[in-house]
């Protein structure tokens, strides 16, 4: 289908960040925020070359004068016009390629509505004229990236988390669970608990600062109550952070209270089960014969699993729920922030995968519904 010199493009569209690059590479070339911004004010300076929309980092840097929109909410595309802008930006500005010359592998959230897959397919063939394309489920790609074909993936990004049991390369849809608790919620929660300490963060620009604090200083406690006592009795857990204006703030128990919400969503006023329970529930929805393989291959993926201590805590919590003799192994690869993209890069460069692409010819013959027959 595709010549060796024409590398496939791999595009992983997340709620928070878009990751894009070439199949065969070991990391994405372009990583930028999945945002589209439009000016709030009328331009007054002629010849400034002001645009009617900005995408990604440029939108982020001009956010003071723009209205920002996220076309992907909770992992699912909700605004196709803006999504098209993001793809256009990905191909032409970030990767600097002509999409009509490369096969494109896109990723989708688990349980993505059928109409959405068709729309993605249609846009790729009709707007960007790609010679071939394929749509793969994000969690499945993360599992490939860890070198497995069977296991359960807990994938948590900025907008949504999922537990996806996979057996011999196929996701088991009846056992997939979605949890609308992810990075953005943790950032909001950290903003809230920092306010209680007397630091005020409210604007979207300040939210980015808090996101940085979260990424640099937060961690998951092995024993939450114990850690709270340690934090109360000594200052050993305190860390300082310098704000862009030079002011230095100190944070203590907020460092582990923030990601604790993953295990105790009640902190956010949510009634849902924590990530350990959700993982367990997902395994229990699977056939009794394959549970052992899932417990022994629990893979973490996505940016919101990057907190230090999360794997040990997950091990402890799942062990407490599982049958006593069960062997439980939590796999947290160091590159898990990009493991979906890496899995896509691996998949698209396999020789055995080359007959799996949906070609332009097949699309012209069958229309968008071809995606359900070829991508599953």
From Swiss-Prot:
SMART domains, A to Z: ACTIN
Q: Which chemical reaction does it catalyze? A: ATP + H2O = ADP + phosphate + H(+)
Q: Which residues carry this modification: Tele-methylhistidine?
A: 74
For the modification N-acetylaspartate, the affected residues are 3
Q: Name one GO molecular function term.
A: hydrolase activity
Residues with N6-methyllysine modification: 85
Say if the entry is tagged with keyword Nucleotide-binding. Answer: yes
UniProt keyword annotations, A-Z: Acetylation, ATP-binding, Cytoplasm, Cytoskeleton, Hydrolase, Methylation, Nucleotide-binding, Oxidation
Q: Where in the cell is it found?
A: Cytoplasm, Cytoskeleton
Q: What is its EC number?
A: 3.6.4.-
State the family named in the UniProt similarity comment for this chain: Belongs to the actin family.
Q: What is this protein called?
A: Actin, cytoplasmic
Query: Which organism does this record belong to?
Result: Pisaster ochraceus (Ochre sea star)
């Amino acid at each position: 289908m595709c010549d060796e010199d024409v590398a496939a493009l791999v595009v992983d569209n997340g709620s928070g960040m878009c990751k894009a690059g070439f199949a065969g590479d070991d990391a994405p070339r372009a990583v930028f925020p999945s945002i589209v911004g439009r000016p709030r004010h009328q331009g007054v300076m002629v010849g400034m070359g002001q645009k009617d929309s900005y995408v990604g980092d440029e939108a982020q840097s001009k956010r003071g004068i723009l209205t920002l929109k996220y076309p992907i909410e909770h992992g699912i595309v909700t605004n196709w016009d803006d999504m098209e802008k993001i793809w256009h930006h990905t191909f032409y500005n970030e990767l600097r390629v002509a999409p009509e010359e490369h096969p494109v592998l896109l990723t989708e959230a688990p349980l993505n509505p059928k109409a959405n897959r068709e729309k993605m397919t249609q846009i790729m063939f009709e707007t960007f004229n790609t010679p071939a394309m394929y749509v793969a489920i994000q969690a499945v790609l993360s599992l490939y990236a860890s070198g497995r074909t069977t296991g359960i993936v807990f994938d948590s990004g900025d907008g949504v988390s999922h537990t996806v049991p996979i057996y011999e390369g196929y996701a088991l849809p009846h056992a997939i669970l979605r949890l609308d608790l992810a990075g953005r919620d943790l950032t909001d929660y950290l903003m809230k608990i920092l306010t209680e300490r007397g630091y005020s963060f409210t604007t979207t620009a300040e939210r980015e600062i808090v996101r940085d604090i979260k990424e640099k200083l937060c961690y998951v406690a092995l024993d939450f109550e114990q850690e709270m006592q340690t934090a109360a009795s000594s200052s050993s857990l305190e860390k300082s952070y310098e704000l862009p204006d030079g002011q230095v703030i100190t944070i203590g128990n907020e460092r582990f209270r923030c990601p604790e919400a993953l295990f105790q969503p009640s902190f956010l006023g949510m009634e849902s089960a924590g990530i350990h329970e959700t993982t367990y529930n997902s395994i229990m929805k699977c056939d009794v014969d394959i549970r052992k393989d899932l417990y022994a291959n629990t893979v973490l993926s996505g940016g919101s699993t990057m907190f230090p201590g999360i794997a040990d805590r997950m091990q402890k919590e799942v062990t407490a729920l599982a049958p006593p003799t069960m062997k439980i192994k939590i796999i947290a690869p160091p590159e898990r922030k990009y493991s979906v993209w890496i899995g896509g890069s691996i998949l698209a460069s396999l020789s055995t995968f080359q007959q799996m692409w949906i070609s332009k010819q097949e699309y012209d013959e069958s229309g968008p519904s071809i995606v359900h027959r070829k991508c599953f």
